[in-house]
Amino acid sequence: MALEHKTGILPQKAGKGYVSGMMVFEFFSTGMPAIAASAGADFLMYDMEHTGIGFETLKDQMAACRGLDIAPLVRVPTTEGNTVGQVLDIGSHGVMVPMVETAEQARDLVRRAYYPPEGARGTAFGIAHDDYGTAHPIDIMQAANQRTLVIAMIETARGLANV
């Protein structure tokens, strides 16, 4: 399976100027990605922090984005456990993480989001994030690392002081 398309929608579009998108808090219809893409959105940011959206609904949304010219992203509620890896495994092109206050927390976030050598994300192949393909694992990890966007949210005085 060729992985050219897996280098990431956002990096390709950002190189041409700007990107636009929207937060998704409600209305998790599988038609939402197609509507947003036809309206010109480059990404959808699904919010797990402030909504009740779970992994099953997110899996449906990630699948609905597949094949469209739109990148699904997820704001996770925490880096605890394997939430970051799970949302990436189900097809998210990146994560936004709230309340990052220290350089150590930022490093941990990067470690969880990227495959070696950039990070230490656990491996899983032939699943949603690689379109259920059969490419060589090294190629899959490299493509995923190129595609993955990590956003650390600085929301506190402590976080700002540590920037």
How should these model regions be labeled?
Residues 31-33, 38-60:
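Glycine-rich, proline-tolerant flexible connector loops at the mouths of alpha/beta enzymes
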Residues 47-49, 76, 97-100:
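Short beta->alpha connector loops at strand-helix junctions that form conserved
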Residues 22, 36, 47, 95, ...:
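Conserved, mostly hydrophobic/aromatic
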Residues 39-43, 89-94, 114-115:
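Glycine-enriched alpha-helix->loop->beta-strand junction motifs that scaffold or abut catalytic
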Residues 14-30, 72-77, 148-162:
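Active-site mouth loops of central-metabolism enzymes
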Residues 1-23, 134-148:
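N-terminal amphipathic alpha-helix/helix-capping segment at the start of soluble metabolic enzymes
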